[in-house]
């Protein structure tokens, strides 16, 4: 279990970014990231320039359409995005999955036209089982950001319907011109850090969305231990929390951060437990056919918000 900081939404001069591919990888190294995904708009031309000796990287693309932006990671071949429209997106996603790709919804509530044509998600997905992840947090953190709040609400509603969708953060990294408090996605990568194992972590729900601090949990039940993304039975459990508040401390710039509590959230956004961050082991009686995620709450510059959100565990 590693939980390594990754950036899964990056652009270069092959679309509208300012980095060359090598500059992007070097900047990610300087930012102490373990892995990136190159997701230029409607092109994979930069992927051939990726050098895993500089930094392990995922080959991807951001489908940039009039009806939303969709991230495709690791597909073994081309799927035509140019004729993607609201009512054929399920078929398009199936084509991506058939080529081994991982599918993510980018910034579903970003401002659309005229600010960013197609930036808001307007595709009509009927089978969310084929969607692997959703960007619930996007770009720099300003905590009056309704776009992120709405994305978390959408993700929660899909979890309630039984869809197992991983949560991610996307910096949407184009350059270093923009200043701000940028987060990361922590991936629990099993084995070597590479595209294959990173994609497996996303598929399996082993993801944590964070403003910087690292928090994850394990669940103990009847002699067995379960990790984020896994499924267990209903009944009495012990949740064990692991927290590193200084994991990416350099990224907080001048923000004043205070970490206050851990919450466990379940169906409907209900909080079933809240404890001080010093309390690392709690008992929770899990219900059948539910999901449970952990959130680290605190304040940034006096505004109270979740600072870490994990993907859930599930009960059957």
Q: Language-model features: where?
A:
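Extended two-metal-dependent nuclease catalytic cores across DNA- and RNA-processing enzymes
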Residues: 132, 162-164, 207
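Generic secondary-structure transition motif, activating predominantly at the C-termini of alpha-helices
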Residues: 97, 159, 203-206
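Short, structured coil segments at secondary-structure junctions
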Residues: 52-54, 130, 163, 182-183
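Structural motif
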Residues: 28, 123-129, 160, 254, ...
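C-terminal functional module detector
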Residues: 1-3, 23, 166, 173-316
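Short hydrophobic/aromatic segments of transmembrane alpha-helices and their interfaces
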Residues: 26-27, 157-160, 191
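Metal-dependent active-site segment of extracytoplasmic phospho-/sulfohydrolases and closely related
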Residues: 159-169
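A metal-dependent hydrolase metal-coordination microenvironment
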Residues: 1-116, 120-123, 129, 135-155, ...
